Design a protein with these regions (language model features):
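Positively charged n-region of N-terminal signal peptides that target proteins for export
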Residues: 1-4, 464-465
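Sec-dependent signal peptide recognition
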Residues: 3-11, 450-454
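Compositionally biased regions
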Residues: 6-7, 17-21, 442-445, 449
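Hydrophobic h-region of N-terminal signal peptides that target proteins for export
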Residues: 12-20, 459-462
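Signature for phosphate-centric chemistry
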Residues: 20-159, 163-442
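Cleavable C-terminal sorting propeptides in eukaryotic secreted/cell-surface proteins
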Residues: 443-465
Length: 465
């Protein structure tokens, strides 16, 4: 009888372990959950809060490019996430009726409570968390750069640019209200620019379309690591056959949106992934953006040229003590706009390109969207006048409020002469007048040539979306 009782206890322990999932998921109280979700990472989880004034230097000019704050899913993403309601029921049925699957019990309970609650009218608009991110960013910027931002507030002293897209405009308004007060619309009106969410004029460019259609990200989805991930997730959820890749990505979208929208939450769908799987999905997203908006396509750097040229023009004017220029410029745009601007400024460039086959070798990659392009991501250039050292004029760059240290600078503090020389090609009259697309492979034999100089107005509009 005693032996039978022992066997029953062992059986119960085994069943309990099966339901708890062992190492197949992290517990909600995990002291170190993996929360880096590529370009949909919550800003509050990654920004650098340790700002130190530059000794013997005073800021005289600030320029910032700011991505819109945390937003709700767009229409297509919302449709995909809503389909998880039926899928959720299948997962629960697998565990409770068919006794298949290996999810943690608390994750299964959390999954039962999960609901997708986003009003269709709010889709792709800034969220309350996004508004708070903008307010906090404005306060910190105002505190750090008080010497620049305490000047008389008017449209000549400060410039704010944003597209008319809701989430971008609302981000700019939240930031400006905190920075300049409730009357900012009269004192420092936001200059609206044409909304444009695509590379108009570049969609027929083979160099760009080939990078998208033949993306390394598509090949990565066929890699052994990726296929094994899909297989393991399917088994964990109790399916005898692999679930579709679209379901995996809907789960991932729900996970990262929920975390970004409610920072203190433990999203139900996040618990369905292991730490290693979240890292693999992060790499997939980074790889996708590397070829869409990154160094994987040569044309992307050219698209960012107009904004980089504008920035260098401002810095040059400050160096020449030109009084006919603003004290600060704030630009609000899209993820793609921020990234193509960073490309033009050689930020987050890896010595070895990201590919579908070097995932493990790219663990410490610079092109990590969670650190470069999270929600509310930003890049700033601050011009300093210094009393000591061999040069009065210095420039420091900040990526998500952390010092960005260009090689050749002193812990991030760069001499203006160094920056001027590094980006001299943006200071000439034809800084963006370069051929960026030539097609000699079409059957028609017609060459397609796109010149950035002809697309500068379009590129500027695109970069501000």
């Amino acid at each position: 009888m005693k032996g039978l009782s022992s066997r029953i206890l062992l059986l119960l322990a085994f069943l309990s372990a099966s339901l708890s999932g062992g190492d197949s998921c992290y517990e909600p109280m995990d002291p170190d959950p993996y929360l880096y979700f590529s370009h949909k990472t919550a800003y509050q989880l990654i920004f650098n809060s340790k700002f130190k004034p530059v000794p013997y230097c005073r800021p005289t000019f600030v320029w910032m490019f700011i991505r819109s704050g945390t937003s709700y899913p767009n229409t297509n993403e919302s449709l995909a996430i809503r389909q998880l309601h039926q899928f959720k029921d299948r997962v629960i049925k697998n565990h409770e009726e068919r006794r298949n699957g290996n999810l943690c019990k608390n994750v299964l309970d959390s999954l039962k409570r999960w609901e997708f609650e986003v009003n269709p009218t709010s889709e792709d608009d800034i969220s309350p968390q996004g508004r708070m991110d903008m307010q906090l960013l404005a306060r910190r910027t105002k505190d750090k750069m008080s010497e620049v931002l305490v000047k008389e507030i008017n449209k000549n002293t400060f410039k704010i640019y944003a597209s008319e897209e809701r989430k971008v405009m609302n981000s700019a308004e939240e930031f400006s209200k905190t920075m300049f007060g409730d009357n900012f619309k009269y004192n420092v009106p936001i200059e609206k620019v044409q909304s444009n969410s695509s590379f108009i004029g570049l969609e027929s460019c083979p160099k760009w379309t080939d990078a998208i259609q033949n993306s390394e990200a598509s090949l990565f989805r066929k890699s052994p690591e990726y296929m094994e991930m899909v297989s393991q997730i399917s088994k964990r959820l109790g399916f005898l056959e692999n679930i579709t890749d679209s379901i995996v990505h809907a789960m991932y979208e729900s996970c990262r949106y929920n975390k970004a929208l409610v920072i203190e939450s433990y999203p139900a769908w996040c618990g369905l992934f292991t730490r290693q799987e979240l890292q693999l999905l992060e790499y997939y997203e980074d790889l996708d953006y590397y070829y869409k908006y990154g160094y994987g396509s040569e044309i992307n750097t050219k698209v960012g040229c107009p904004i980089a040229k504008e920035l260098m023009g401002y810095l040059s004017a400050v160096a020449k003590n030109d009084s006919d220029r603003p004290s600060a410029v704030f630009r609000f745009g899209s993820s793609a706009g921020l990234l193509t601007t960073l490309l033009a400024l050689d930020v987050a460039k890896d010595p070895v390109p990201l590919t579908h086959y070097n995932y493990h070798a790219q663990y410490r990659r610079q092109w990590r969207m969670s650190q470069v392009d999270p929600f509310s991501g930003n890049f700033a250039a601050v011009f300093y006048k210094c009393d000591q050292g061999d040069e009065e004029n210095k420039v420091m760059f900040y990526l998500n409020e952390g010092v960005y240290d260009y090689p050749g600078c002193n812990v991030g503090l760069c001499s203006w002469k160094f920056i001027e020389n590094k980006f001299r090609h943006y200071l000439g009259p034809n800084g963006c007048d370069e051929e960026v697309c030539r097609d000699q492979s079409r059957a028609s034999g017609v060459r397609s040539v796109v010149w950035v100089v002809a697309l500068i107005p379009i590129a500027l509009a695109y970069l501000r979306v």
